[in-house]
UniProtKB/Swiss-Prot annotation:
Transmembrane segments: none annotated. One of its GO terms (biological process) is 'de novo' UMP biosynthetic process. The keyword Transferase applies. This is Aspartate carbamoyltransferase catalytic subunit. The lineage of its organism: Bacteria, Pseudomonadati, Campylobacterota, Epsilonproteobacteria, Campylobacterales. One of its GO terms (molecular function) is aspartate carbamoyltransferase activity. It comes from Campylobacter jejuni subsp. jejuni serotype O:2 (strain ATCC 700819 / NCTC 11168). Pfam families: OTCace, OTCace_N. SUPFAM superfamilies: Aspartate/ornithine carbamoyltransferase (SSF53671).
Length: 295
């Protein structure tokens, strides 16, 4: 039984196959690959983009979607994770997409399920489909020529599952990664590090990936105000100037904190393209896992 818990669960050949499939799905036409199949989504953390994206992907493949309301589920009444897994499995879904505030929950569920489990984000640990769609966006923009491209990841890197998954995946595809964050947002890493964003860093980047400040994962106040943070790390036109690059963000964007209003409307900012690509990538992932499991 295969699952997608981290980006390491797919090798490079499989990822390129996913990209080829996802490219076909960008036409947004409905398919019947998963007709008669049932996909359950259970998100223990709030989500708009990821949940909607997975559900759109499932429906475009012809699958039925069962969204479990966590606020009314038995887990909110004290049911153990193992009992939750057993009950989910008894419903015989063809796949489960799960998000949880605690790292490791999707892996625990996967050990007790008889269907593929897809990690929709767990704590600070991983968000594999986000990293896949980010690389897919980069891959398409540079027409497959991604090796050696310089990417600057800016923001709350230490607390970001998006950063963790991207660092693993982009390293495997030989992108040149630089991290920019204040000291308390910087993980222990061998990668190049800077503690303030400046023009020279941007001038030497092909891609900038801005990240949201994960205030819900902070144990204490680390900035007097987000405006103080923005002074050093907001992506602004005055910094980017006319540099030929692309700007990514996993969403939701804190405007004028992560990225300025002016840059959000700039043609180099591909946030909405990431959203479109995300549905296609998740279609490819669901199709692969479900059909391989039944094959």
């Amino acid at each position: 039984m295969r699952h997608l818990i981290t980006t390491k669960d797919f090798n490079k050949v499989e990822i390129m196959e996913l990209f080829k499939e996802a490219s076909d799905f960008l036409d947004e036409k409905p398919r019947t690959f998963l007709e008669g199949k049932s996909i359950t989504t259970i998100f223990f953390e709030n989500s708009t983009r990821t949940l909607s994206s997975f559900e759109s992907a499932a429906r475009r493949l012809g699958a039925r979607v069962l969204r479990l309301d966590v606020s009314r589920s038995s887990s909110s009444k004290g049911e153990t994770l193992y009992d939750t897994a057993a009950n989910l499995d008894a419903m015989s879904p063809n796949a489960i997409v799960v998000r949880h505030a605690n790292s490791g929950v999707p892996l625990i569920l996967a050990k007790h399920m008889h269907c593929p489990v897809v990690n929709g984000g767990d704590g600070k640990h991983a968000h594999p489909t986000q990293a896949l769609l980010d690389l897919f966006t980069i891959y398409n923009h540079f027409q497959g020529n991604v090796e050696g491209k310089k990417i600057c990841i800016v923001g709350d890197i230490k607390n970001s599952r998006v950063a963790a998954s991207n660092i693993e995946l982009l390293s495997r595809f030989n992108l040149d990664i630089t991290l920019v964050a204040p000291p308390h947002f910087m993980p222990n890493t061998h990668l190049k590090k800077h503690y303030k964003l400046d023009e020279n860093i941007i001038a030497n980047s092909d891609i900038i990936m801005s990240l949201r400040t994960q205030t819900e994962r902070h144990n204490k106040t680390v900035y007097a105000s987000l405006k103080d943070y923005a002074n050093d790390f907001c992506i602004q036109k005055s910094l980017v100037k006319d540099k030929k690059l692309i700007l990514l963000h996993p969403g939701p964007v804190n405007r004028n904190i992560d990225i300025s209003d002016e840059m959000m409307s700039n043609e180099r900012t591909l946030v909405l393209k990431q959203v479109k690509n995300g549905v296609a990538i998740r279609m490819a992932v669901l199709k692969k896992l479900i059909l391989e499991n039944e094959g």
